[in-house]
């Protein structure tokens, strides 16, 4: 059995760890989830609760669950191709093997409109010889198109969340004016009612369930 080269293995680990934060933001479900959670917090009106660390932790845990099948496929591909190539090219071979599961995930969840935009943009701003070799399923196209698709979807969800809570704000503001309490800030009075509605509807479960199932 061939023993793995320690130097090559260490280099692979360092490169993977360096790319991990970037990959978590652009080729996983993390971006959409953390943006939706942030918009929810703003819509309720509690700016610091949950704190940013908690929101990011929840988004990371949910993203790990969503991306687990992709990660397992990437790990399997890397294990199968570990011995391939020379010591100098082994990192390239492993990265090439790992990218296919992520590429398939991006293909499935990227809007055609965004892919078409980046393909057209490449024709306009790239050198002609480079643009001619670019394909719509290349990571250079899929990564930005996927990120833009995720942000668009996140803001759509945030818009719907805001609509629900704005209704409560309007009702509370009108009620305070009718009682002659125009000096009272409607936002502060509305927060308990927003929290009550959110808890009564089991809002956390509904929101997280919906986000997870959006990646079916």
From Swiss-Prot:
A GO cellular-component term linked to this record: plasma membrane
**Which InterPro entries does the protein's record reference?**
T3SS_IM_P, T3SS_YscR-like
Q: Name one GO biological process term.
A: protein secretion
* Subcellular location as annotated: Cell membrane
**Source organism, top-level taxon:** Bacteria
- Function, in words: Important for pathogenicity.
Record's NCBIfam families? PRK12797.1 (NF009438), yscR (TIGR01102)
The name under which this protein is listed is: Pathogenicity-related ORF2
